[in-house]
């Protein structure tokens, strides 16, 4: 492609509203433009990268035995009502009515559509297992779209869905998809981790997220420093054991703590460590109140609370709800003298607290000399806290470290979550009706483009891996007015194309400095510069990733480029 005939609107200045590196560079290098908040146009360079990423995904999906189709973005409310998600999904679901007042949604996912399709078309075990996938636009009404393509309101996803007659069959496909995803992200050149995760609004049980390591990641990954263990911080179990001290039990005493609200303030005021304090948090778990107790230096994990009660919705109680249930303010909560209508559960670490401190359910007062079981009853002890750096790894190997990650893929074992709700059944070998078992597997395709840009960039611009770069070679004629340079560049533009390379040829009548700056900004892996030694048949090659440059004869050009791209 000749750059003079293309559409690559580069920018010299960083756009004011672009917060992160990938967003800044994709805008500046002419890959994307914002159409509305969280909505983007892929310009020609961006479209080429998108197509490269999609091609890798298709190859790996097809290799894993998945079959491509295309489902509608506009989905009838009836299907979402059958699954129950029409009522539970929340404000992120974009809803609309047609001219006949019928309800529709712009799909954030396609579980309902695919389940209805397979339910209506597959009637016998002989047609299973079946895995179908699509690459399609999705919609989510994000409260605050940010970071460019990383969190938009319209985005492109690859979503696959598998249907099975047995758990063993699902396990086999899940493992194939897990391996396919690993191959996809490896081929994109990414530094990533597959982590144990929570299924969220999709539902289901076993699930892994594929996280690209990045300082701007919205998720925290807990990983072992001595093994391959990695999990989303919400899901990492705590295996720490706690020794209970043998100090004599003191009597329970209520003390005045004026103006002391936080654990740090109370601990300092009473001259104890946070480990001696019991932190009390009131959650609304579906339709009941639960008081969750954790040690003062720990944080309560709402996902673990949700899983403990197998709940649909878990939220911190509002100040008004706290007043209603506990008759006190949030900063004074404690487990002593609580109404029987409130369930009390505690993290394992609380069991080891001796002569501790807790709120007295009265403004400006706390209890000291607090001992669980003696002073209040706990319904159940469980792992209810977030794992922390320095905790032992759940696999027993090494200790936990934290990293930030951008989620680019997610695989789920859905089980019968959707098939049962939507009556997706088949006839087994004995002619009996059975419910299909499902899995689903998603990749954020447009988000993946941004994640690659986030990992592969330097102070001068983007540095695309060869596998997803918009072009293999950026050919630059230093002086377009010089006949020898222009002729040699024209000749090798044709020859490189014939040799199978994708070439962007900068034939613009611009200064050399502008061309080189744009080349670095765009980030094509190999730059070939035709300059002063054109009359000798000598050109300069520069590797974008390493900055390495060399002069070579044009006779060696094709072999040299091929070798460099394979490194």
Swiss-Prot record:
Coiled coil: none annotated. Gene3D superfamilies: Anticodon-binding domain, Bira Bifunctional Protein, Domain 2, YbaK/aminoacyl-tRNA synthetase-associated domain. It catalyses: tRNA(Pro) + L-proline + ATP = L-prolyl-tRNA(Pro) + AMP + diphosphate. This is Proline--tRNA ligase. Its EC number is 6.1.1.15. Its main location: cytoplasm. One of its GO terms (cellular component) is cytosol. Catalyzes the attachment of proline to tRNA(Pro) in a two-step reaction: proline is first activated by ATP to form Pro-AMP and then transferred to the acceptor end of tRNA(Pro). As ProRS can inadvertently accommodate and process non-cognate amino acids such as alanine and cysteine, to avoid such errors it has two additional distinct editing activities against alanine. One activity is designated as 'pretransfer' editing and involves the tRNA(Pro)-independent hydrolysis of activated Ala-AMP. Consists of three domains: the N-terminal catalytic domain, the editing domain and the C-terminal anticodon-binding domain. Keywords: Aminoacyl-tRNA synthetase, ATP-binding, Cytoplasm, Ligase, Nucleotide-binding, Protein biosynthesis. CDD domains: ProRS-INS (cd04334), ProRS_anticodon_short (cd00861), ProRS_core_prok (cd00779). The keyword Ligase applies. It is found in: Cytoplasm.
